[in-house]
């Protein structure tokens, strides 16, 4: 058999012998019949035993046995019983043999009406076949099939169906069956609740009924009458609400003991306090709690009843205050849990109506009552406690939601924490202190936020109750504040406020470090804060800690953003282009390219020969010559501001400065003019390539990506996770300039073109990272082998990357003097970085160590492995680019000759740059000898 999962009842059908009385089993829970019980009948004992058996059910298998025994005991000639339980939302399932009850015909009629239905058998179409063959109509004239739907009125649905093949019923048997039906439904509810809670200790089985008085033992009438009354009471105890259940029990006790009122004082789990929610026939609006001390505490300890004469004056005063009347008589009886053998409540009866004292018989009545009702009472209380916990969990989730919506302002968040903590714990006052170095600071109170720092409260982090909690990290529950050595009552004396009790708990962050303390003062509906309040505070503090930590972090991030924004504003202010500058630039209009130099569009032209002051106009001239200004309707003043802003955006390291950016942009112009790029790329792609060349090294610091990561710079923190640290920074600076007022040259673009332009710029600028070039080199070779396909988008992306890299290294395509001068500038930068790395305690690469680097060999290696393969690919794709490859190869030969000369002669000193400043000659390619001086004018080329 075993226990079914979820709501599925597994049942067995069986042929039964003649009905036999059932053994009394376990503890019972009864439902009140709809009609008054008839006079005692000979079968009353059998019915009572059957209902007691149902009352002891705690699992599925026990429920099945109890249902069979109960129906066999109260119904005539029971032949077959099938029990079905709702499985899921609609299926009614039986196990033995496994089958589902079809909800058709008579069964469907009974389920819809939710009323028992008797018939001379079920239709063949209503049955699943063989399992229910015995129930097919017609049956014998003196037998019938009962279809009994058990409807859960709270859920508004049928929870189970019982099919019984039995004889015709008499009136007494009809009444007994009603009782069995209701008790079966209650037993089913209890089993389902126990299943949801998980495994618990099973209640002990009831041994024998309590011994009656001497009068009871003289005859069975008194015992039967009392048992009938308790049976009727148990039939009413189907409530899941503890207050409603207490009302019924207390009314029964008042009637049986002739007391003016009764109450149940529930004992807390920690045995420290009593609570009362129901007095007589009245449910209190607020639960009353008071300490479990004095004589009442002795009752819990000794498990013995007491009367009024045994109470102290303090106990009497406490009870009279709760009841609102004077006590003339009282009987207090401990209610003991069968599961734990501990006192769970005190049943109290007050002021006998006849003015007499309570007797031993009254005590026996109370004990007899709770002998049968204590289990259902404790189960209901436990269920209600779990419901309360569920509500508290839901409240905590709502609290968490409220807290996490106020992360943008710490003060507002703390005010929300105070409000929620006070509401959850029913405290009069709440204060929150944040730990600031060695002090606890409070500037948010119940009354609001203190803006003036002179009014905020600061206390040492190791003093007082809050300081103790902050130091130890442990919660502190103080029932009597004035009796605690850490409490300072001077504030109470000066304000007139009385602090009765305190619950102080730490607030910790994710690392379990104390970041604050919350202090709750004066429990409103209890003598002090309970263990439940401690658990609630502990759970609440987790949400507080996370929200406060994130709010403080959010504040720091905001402050950092404000500082960054301010720094950007300052940078943009100093980079700001005055009206005079761009007006002067455009005063005579845009100069034609031919006016700059007759060879300006030739690969042999050296852009570094142009004075820096003339470079901005040269940029405008190139853009106009490529017809981008007209095609994209670019506003000339905006373009002028943009060019001047980009120029100012470059720092002044030896190599990566504005003149490098201008040289790279000029080479892009040369590619456009000499290689007919319009046959390979779209206009917007060429435009993006040119603008990217201008911006590709914005704000370069003269150090590479590896240095940024090793030095843990701000740039590395921003971009290291994505790679290409400096390149991403260059792109970000370009976007910052475009976002500067009056500098957005793409302002007239459509949304689609604007987004595409920015995407192209990002990809092209990131392609200047040589690590990126090496990753795509095989793809570039493959594209060169198969030929460029203008319709292939991947070829467009690869070609743009190749063109950008060739522009970036274009100094290597110029004459020897330019190449040698550029090498000097580059290695000055490298050696400066190497010096910084040495100062940091790191070992620089050989090429950046001025004491180890041999520039000719380094340049030869660079030419052979990086520059020459790039321009070889360019030559394969564009035959007109052959002269570029040849010039790079020529420069490589020059470096070989220089290396050979100094291998024989030796370097002038241990400083690797010295030889570049020395006058020497090497044979030129045409056999002549030309002077080489790093400081000579580049115009000589």
Curated annotation (Swiss-Prot):
Reported effect, residue 847 to L: Decreased 3',5'-cyclic-AMP phosphodiesterase activity. Loss of 3',5'-cyclic-GMP phosphodiesterase activity
Cofactor binding remark: Binds 2 divalent metal cations per subunit. Site 1 may preferentially bind zinc ions. Binds 2 divalent metal cations per subunit. Site 2 has a preference for magnesium ions.
Outcome, altering residue 819 to Y: Loss of 3',5'-cyclic-AMP phosphodiesterase activity. Loss of 3',5'-cyclic-GMP phosphodiesterase activity
Secretion signal, residue range per the UniProt entry: none
Lipidation (N-myristoyl glycine): 2
Enzyme class: hydrolase
One annotated Gene Ontology cellular component of this protein: mitochondrial matrix
Activity regulation: The 3',5'-cyclic-AMP phosphodiesterase activity is stimulated by 3',5'-cyclic GMP.
SUPFAM superfamilies noted in UniProt: GAF domain-like, HD-domain/PDEase-like
Tissue: Widely expressed. Expressed in brain, with high expression observed in the corpus striatum. Also expressed in heart, placenta, lung, skeletal muscle, kidney and pancreas.
Alphabetical UniProt keywords: cAMP, Cell membrane, cGMP, cGMP-binding, Cytoplasm, Disease variant, Hydrolase, Intellectual disability, Lipoprotein, Membrane, Metal-binding, Mitochondrion, Mitochondrion inner membrane, Mitochondrion outer membrane, Myristate, Nucleotide-binding, Palmitate, Repeat, Zinc
Cofactor or coenzyme needed: Zn(2+); Mg(2+)
Region entry Disordered, spans: 16-42, 196-221
Disease link: Intellectual developmental disorder with paroxysmal dyskinesia or seizures: An autosomal recessive disorder characterized by global developmental delay, impaired intellectual development, language delay, and early-onset paroxysmal hyperkinetic movement disorder that manifests as sudden falls or backward propulsion, eye or head deviation, and dystonic limb posturing followed by chorea and dyskinetic movements. Some patients may also develop epileptic seizures or only have seizures without a movement disorder.
Quaternary structure and interacting proteins, as annotated: Homodimer.
Protein name as annotated: cGMP-dependent 3',5'-cyclic phosphodiesterase
Organism lineage string: Eukaryota, Metazoa, Chordata, Craniata, Vertebrata
């Amino acid at each position: 058999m075993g226990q079914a999962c979820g709501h599925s009842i597994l049942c067995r059908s069986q042929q039964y012998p003649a009905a036999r009385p059932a053994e009394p089993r376990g503890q019972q829970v009864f439902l009140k019949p709809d009609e008054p019980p008839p006079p005692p009948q000979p079968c009353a004992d059998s019915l009572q035993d059957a209902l007691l058996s149902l009352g002891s059910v705690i699992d599925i298998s026990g429920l099945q046995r109890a249902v069979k025994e109960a129906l066999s005991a109260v119904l005539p000639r029971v032949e077959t019983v099938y029990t079905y339980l709702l499985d899921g939302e609609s299926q009614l399932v039986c196990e033995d043999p496994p089958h589902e009850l079809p909800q058709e015909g008579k069964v469907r009629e009974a389920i819809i009406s939710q009323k028992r239905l008797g018939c001379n058998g079920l239709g063949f179409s209503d049955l699943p076949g063989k399992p229910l063959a015995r129930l097919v109509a017609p049956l014998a004239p003196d037998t019938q099939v009962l279809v009994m739907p058990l409807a859960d009125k709270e859920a508004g649905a049928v929870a189970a169906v019982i099919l019984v093949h039995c004889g015709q019923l008499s009136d007494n048997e009809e009444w007994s069956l009603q009782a069995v039906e209701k008790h079966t439904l209650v037993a089913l509810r209890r089993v389902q609740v126990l299943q949801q809670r998980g495994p618990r200790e099973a209640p002990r089985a009831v041994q024998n009924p309590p011994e009656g008085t001497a009068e009871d033992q003289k005859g069975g009438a008194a015992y039967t009458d009392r048992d009938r009354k308790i049976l009727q009471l148990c039939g009413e105890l189907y409530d899941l609400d503890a207050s409603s259940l207490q009302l019924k029990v207390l009314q029964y006790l008042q009637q049986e003991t002739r007391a003016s009122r009764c109450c149940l004082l529930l004992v807390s789990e920690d045995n420290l306090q009593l609570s009362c929610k129901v007095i007589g026939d009245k449910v209190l609006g607020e639960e009353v709690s008071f300490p479990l001390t004095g004589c009442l505490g002795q009752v819990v300890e000794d498990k013995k009843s007491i009367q009024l004469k045994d109470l102290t004056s303090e106990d009497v005063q406490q009870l009279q205050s709760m009841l609102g009347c004077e006590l003339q008589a009282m009987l207090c009886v401990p209610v003991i849990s069968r599961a734990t053998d501990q006192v769970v409540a005190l049943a109290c009866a007050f002021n006998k109506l006849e003015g007499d004292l309570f007797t031993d018989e009254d005590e026996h009545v109370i004990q007899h009552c709770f002998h049968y009702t204590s289990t259902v009472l404790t189960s209901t209380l436990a269920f209600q406690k779990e419901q309360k916990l569920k509500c508290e969990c839901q409240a905590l989730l709502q609290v968490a939601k409220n807290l996490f919506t106020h992360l943008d302002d710490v003060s507002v968040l703390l005010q929300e924490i105070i409000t929620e903590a006070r509401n959850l714990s029913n405290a009069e006052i709440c204060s929150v202190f944040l730990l600031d170095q060695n002090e606890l600071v409070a500037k948010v109170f119940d009354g609001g936020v203190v803006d003036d720092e002179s009014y905020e409260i600061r206390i040492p982090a190791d003093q007082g109750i809050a300081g103790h909690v902050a130091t130890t990290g442990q919660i502190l529950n103080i029932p009597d504040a004035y009796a605690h050595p850490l409490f300072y009552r001077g504030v109470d004396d000066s304000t007139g406020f009385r602090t009765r009790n305190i619950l102080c708990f730490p607030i910790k962050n994710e690392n379990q470090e104390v970041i604050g303390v919350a202090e709750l003062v004066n429990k409103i509906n209890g003598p002090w804060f309970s263990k439940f309040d401690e658990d609630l505070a502990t759970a609440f503090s987790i949400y507080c800690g996370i929200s406060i930590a994130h709010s403080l972090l959010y504040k720091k991030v905001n402050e950092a953003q404000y500082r960054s924004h301010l720094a950007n504003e300052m940078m943009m202010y100093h980079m700001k282009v005055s009206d005079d500058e761009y007006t002067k630039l455009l005063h005579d209009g845009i100069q034609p390219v031919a006016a700059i130099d007759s060879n300006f569009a030739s690969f042999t032209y050296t852009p570094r020969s142009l004075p820096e002051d003339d470079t901005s106009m040269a940029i405008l001239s190139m853009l106009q010559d490529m017809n981008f200004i007209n095609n994209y309707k670019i506003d000339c003043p905006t373009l002028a501001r943009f060019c001047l802003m980009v120029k100012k955006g470059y720092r002044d390291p030896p190599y990566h400065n504005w003149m490098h950016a201008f040289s790279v942009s000029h080479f892009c112009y040369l590619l456009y003019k000499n290689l007919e790029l319009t046959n390979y790329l779209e206009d917007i792609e060429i435009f993006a390539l040119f603008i990217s060349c201008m911006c590709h090294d914005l704000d370069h610091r003269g150090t590479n990506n590896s240095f940024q990561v090793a030095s843990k710079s701000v740039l590395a923190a921003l971009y290291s996770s994505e790679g290409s640290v400096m390149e991403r920074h260059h792109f970000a600076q370009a976007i910052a300039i475009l976002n500067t007022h009056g500098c957005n040259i793409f302002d007239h673009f459509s949304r689609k073109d604007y987004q595409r332009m920015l995407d192209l710029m990002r990809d092209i600028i990131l392609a200047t990272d040589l690590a990126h070039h090496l990753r795509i080199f095989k793809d570039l070779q493959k594209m060169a082998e198969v030929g460029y396909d203008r319709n292939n988008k991947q070829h467009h992306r690869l070609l743009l990357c190749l063109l950008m890299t060739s522009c970036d290294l274009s100094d290597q395509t110029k004459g020897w003097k330019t190449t040698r001068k550029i090498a000097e500038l580059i290695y000055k930068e490298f050696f400066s970085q190497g010096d910084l790395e040495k100062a940091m305690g790191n070992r620089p690469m050989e090429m950046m160590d001025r004491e180890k680097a041999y520039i000719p060999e380094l340049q030869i290696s660079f030419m052979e492995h990086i520059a020459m393969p790039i321009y070889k690919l360019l030559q394969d794709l564009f035959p007109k680019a052959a002269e570029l490859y040849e010039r790079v190869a020529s420069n490589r030969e020059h470096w070989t000759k220089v290396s050979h000369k100094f291998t024989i002669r030796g370097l002038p000193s241990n400083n690797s740059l010295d030889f570049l400043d020395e006058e020497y000659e090497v044979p030129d390619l045409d056999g002549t000898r030309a002077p080489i001086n790093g400081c000579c004018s580049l115009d000589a080329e």
